[in-house]
């Protein structure tokens, strides 16, 4: 079969020979005599079928070279796809990483001399160091784009409370990463960093950022009851209980010192915790509003057991409360910040406070209508009273400094 196929290939036209150049070349190189050897026939048959003969070196690798010679092996190796050698990941030791980070803190783009020196120092190739710096710069750009809050050396983490206080303070450095050697390409605004920290962690930055936090410390208890240094050590609930105890004890011994406790100490009842307190503490705020409104009405409140001793002596408390109301009107007229709430509460409270001086003997009639009204307006009137009392306290502290000197 191989010999007959060889004869047919010789008789093919020129177009067929061009279509099968390998076969033609192999046939031409085959012995020309009719008595072809079996090996030549096998070569021709395999070349026609597309296979690579074992004895033909020109067709190795499937190349279509028209001439097969000794150089065909080199050409086949050049065109053959070369397999890339696999390189495993480089494992850096802690010493190498430390030295690389130090170099990166000095500069993000080290020159070739620096890389070679570092390579000799830590035992790596210069190419590995160059690739590490490329990856490190990419990581740094990503962290810079996301923001400082995701940085591994984050000064805004909740765990670093001491660092948080220094960052939020006035002595904030322009770049919080300067102590680590990191240079930012963009200018870092200190005020922006403080605002960002205050926005993300208000529980850590409320006291240093808000100046009114210092006033909140002195709202815990009246100034004549606690020294200024210990005012911030009392919680709202404990100061409220101590205020009630002092209010029940002070009027019996020194009734003249009682009105300042009402006027100056009452802002303790309107801290934000008491405004948004749970239902057990909301009646206390209602009693506080009643306690501010009934000093001139003088009868003891029927539903407030802690405040019963406050109004036991209506004849003694009425003049001082009138003086306190006059001071309240004077202080509210001096404070321009909250004119509308003060005007509303002043126009609302003197209507109840003016009639009692004419009929101090029968206290029950005006007191009968007050508790329902206090209960109805506890959500709005109490807030207005608290705002007015806060302004009054600030004004009294600004003028006198102590609540004992207000009435005297």
Curated annotation (Swiss-Prot):
Residues 85-144 bind DNA. GO terms for molecular function: DNA-binding transcription factor activity, RNA polymerase II-specific; RNA polymerase II transcription regulatory region sequence-specific DNA binding. Residues 50-82, 258-313, 331-379 are annotated as: Disordered. It is found in: Nucleus. Its main location: nucleus. InterPro entries: HD, Homeobox_CS, Homeodomain-like_sf, HTH_motif, OAR_dom, Paired_Homeobox_TFs. One of its GO terms (biological process) is antennal morphogenesis. Residues 297-308, 353-369 have a biased composition (Pro residues). Residues 331-352 have a biased composition (Polar residues). A motif (OAR) lies at residues 378-391. One of its GO terms (cellular component) is protein-containing complex. PANTHER family: HOMEOBOX PROTEIN ARISTALESS. Involved in the morphogenesis of proximal and distal pattern elements in a subset of appendages. Also has a role in early imaginal disk development. This is Homeobox protein aristaless.
């Amino acid at each position: 079969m191989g010999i007959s196929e060889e004869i047919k290939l010789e008789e093919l036209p020129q177009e067929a020979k061009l279509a099968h150049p390998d076969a033609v070349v192999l046939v031409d190189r085959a012995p020309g005599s009719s008595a072809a050897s079996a090996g030549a026939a096998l070569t021709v048959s395999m070349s026609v079928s597309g296979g690579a003969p074992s004895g033909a070196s020109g067709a190795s690798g499937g190349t279509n070279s028209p001439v097969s010679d000794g150089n065909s092996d080199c050409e086949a190796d050049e065109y053959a796809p070369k397999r890339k050698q696999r390189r495993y990941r480089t494992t850096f030791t802690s010493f190498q990483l430390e030295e690389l980070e130090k170099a990166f803190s000095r500069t993000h783009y080290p020159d070739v001399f620096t890389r070679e020196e570092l390579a000799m120092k830590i035992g790596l190739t210069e190419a590995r160091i160059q690739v590490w710096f490329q990856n490190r710069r990419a990581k740094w750009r990503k962290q810079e784009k996301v923001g400082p809050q995701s940085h591994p050396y984050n000064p805004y983490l909740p765990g670093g409370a001491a660092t948080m206080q220094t960052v939020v303070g006035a002595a904030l450095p322009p770049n919080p990463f300067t102590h680590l050697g990191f240079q930012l390409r963009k200018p870092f605004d200190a005020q922006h960093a403080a605002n960002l920290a205050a926005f993300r962690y208000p529980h850590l930055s409320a006291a240093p950022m808000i100046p009114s936090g210092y006033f909140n410390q002195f709202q815990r208890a009246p100034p004549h009851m606690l020294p200024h240094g210990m005012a911030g050590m009392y919680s709202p609930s404990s100061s409220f209980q101590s205020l009630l105890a002092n209010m029940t004890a002070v009027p019996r011994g020194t009734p003249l010192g009682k009105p300042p406790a009402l006027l100056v100490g009452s802002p303790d009842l309107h801290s934000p915790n008491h405004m948004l307190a749970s239902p057990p503490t909301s009646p206390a705020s209602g009693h506080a509003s009643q306690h501010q409104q009934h000093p001139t009405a003088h009868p003891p409140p029927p539903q407030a057991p802690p405040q019963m001793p406050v109004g036991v002596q209506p004849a003694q408390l009425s003049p001082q409360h009138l003086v306190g109301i006059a001071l309240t009107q004077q202080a509210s007229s001096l404070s321009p910040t909250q004119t509308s709430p003060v005007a509303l509460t002043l126009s609302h409270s003197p209507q109840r406070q003016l009639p009692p001086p004419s009929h101090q003997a029968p206290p029950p009639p005006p007191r009968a209508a007050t508790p329902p009204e206090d209960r109805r307006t506890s959500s709005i009137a109490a807030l207005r009273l608290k705002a007015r009392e806060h302004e009054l306290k600030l004004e009294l502290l600004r003028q006198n400094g102590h609540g004992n000197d207000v009435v005297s």
